Amino acid sequence: MSYGAEQAVRDVSFSVPNGEVFAIVGESGSGKSTLVRAAFGMLKQASISGQILLNGTDISTLSDSDWRQLRGTKISMIFQNPSAYLNPNRTVENHFKDLFRAHGESYDVSRVIDMLNLVHLTDGERILQSYPFQLSGGMQQRLAIALSLILKPGIVFADEPTSALDMLVQASVLDLMKEVTQALGATVIIVTHNIKAAARIANSIGVMNKGQLVEVGSATEVMAHPKDEYTRILLDSVMKVV
């Protein structure tokens, strides 16, 4: 995968079993966010070789209209900073209504309140009448999780979903993501620079360095017995911070 003459990601191949969480770990510039954004159809300007398969279909070749139908119902994305894409002029309820309308579904308020309860936003009726800027950062990210899952996609991508949150909130949001996606049977591919956070939520971990996937294994194996020198450096840096 390249931009012009610059190759951002190369020779990357992995598969994720249904219902599991796969974490892609690496420093800024390692190519991890580029990889998931390509898989979500956000990098049309990139030159992509190879395939991105969803249930046997190469989704990298889809038209724009096909991508619009796919996002939300089959795949979804949780971004780093929800305040950057939640519309401050629209109530929370209108965000859900817009999403249902975009995919030709009738709005179901009881279904939405059930989802809000699932992400621990328990005062559903008040939340629906609120505007995003009236919610805390942690509540906004819980709302983003609810929006990404309300149409029951099979795969959820999460690009640094906790990096904009306070340390005390990060762990609870990660635990919530795992709890909710497991309850719904969704497969999760999460990108993070924090290998400790990856181990908290993931069944398996892939480590990226300079555009390549240098190590893949179960979370337990990667944390306890890293095979690649770069993985060991990431683990050492976490230990030094702790």
Where are these regions (language model features)?
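Conserved ABC transporter NBD signature motif
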Residues: 48-58
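ABC ATPase NBD coupling module
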Residues: 59-76, 102, 222-226
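A short, proline-enriched helix->beta-strand linker immediately N-terminal to the Walker B motif
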Residues: 150-154
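A short, surface-exposed alpha-helical micro-motif characterized by mixed small hydrophobic
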Residues: 198-200
